């Protein structure tokens, strides 16, 4: 990436600022890779609050991911709710991705990926139908202990607008650049803080300021 030294300094400045402004995010770790995939497909075009609500509705309505795979997209979109952005598109992507997984393994599970190397696991995830780079990176980061920083369209736009990466850099270039700047142990924190910073309502994620009460001078007894 051109001017990588300057961009590197800018990224580290941003990271320090985000850590000072926001509460430390709790690291998310999925025991089920498929759960991470479904969550990521919803999350890519929705806020965290919208995603949490939509994912909870899916979990409560459908018995398991196999039932979700076999359901009609209209029904899934209705369950996702009107407050979920791009619900019909997400519903189609969910059934396509789950169907692709079933065709690959004859079961609705990706747990076999834990038995192979991370590079190979990432290649397999990238072959799943209707799965984007964001979804692949989110799965690697939160369920396979991979070194990745998932990027939504909104976070990518922010990085370019704020001169944190080259304006002509593509998604893969940005991803590679960021993982060279942010070590694996900090990858989730950086992703979560950057995501929080680009949310429309981030007030709940800001650090709570401690209000100091003015000291009172005790009056001497007379």
Per-segment meaning from a language model:
Residues 39-53, 82-89:
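A short secondary-structure junction motif
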Residues 43-47, 60, 82, 102, ...:
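Amphipathic alpha-helical interaction elements
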């Amino acid at each position: 990436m051109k001017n990588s030294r300057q961009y590197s300094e800018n990224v580290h400045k941003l990271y320090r600022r985000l850590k000072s402004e926001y509460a430390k995010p709790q690291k998310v770790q999925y025991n089920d890779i498929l759960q991470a995939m479904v969550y990521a497909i919803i999350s890519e075009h929705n806020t965290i609050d919208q995603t949490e609500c939509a994912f909870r509705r899916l979990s409560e309505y459908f018995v398991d991911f196999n039932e979700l795979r076999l359901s009609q997209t209209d029904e899934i979109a209705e369950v996702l709710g009107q407050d979920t952005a791009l619900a019909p598109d997400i519903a189609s992507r969910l059934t396509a991705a789950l169907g692709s997984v079933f065709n690959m393994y004859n079961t609705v599970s990706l747990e076999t990926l834990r038995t192979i190397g991370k590079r190979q696991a990432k290649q397999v995830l990238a072959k799943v139908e209707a799965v984007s780079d964001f979804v692949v990176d989110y799965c690697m980061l939160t369920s396979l202990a991979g070194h990745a920083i998932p990027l939504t369209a909104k976070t990518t736009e922010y990085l370019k607008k704020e001169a944190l990466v080259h304006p002509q850099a593509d998604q893969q270039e940005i991803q590679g650049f960021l993982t060279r700047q942010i070590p694996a142990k900090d990858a989730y924190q950086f992703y979560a803080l950057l995501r929080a910073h680009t949310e429309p309502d981030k007030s709940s994620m800001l650090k709570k300021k401690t209000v100091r009460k003015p000291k009172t001078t005790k009056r001497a007894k007379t």
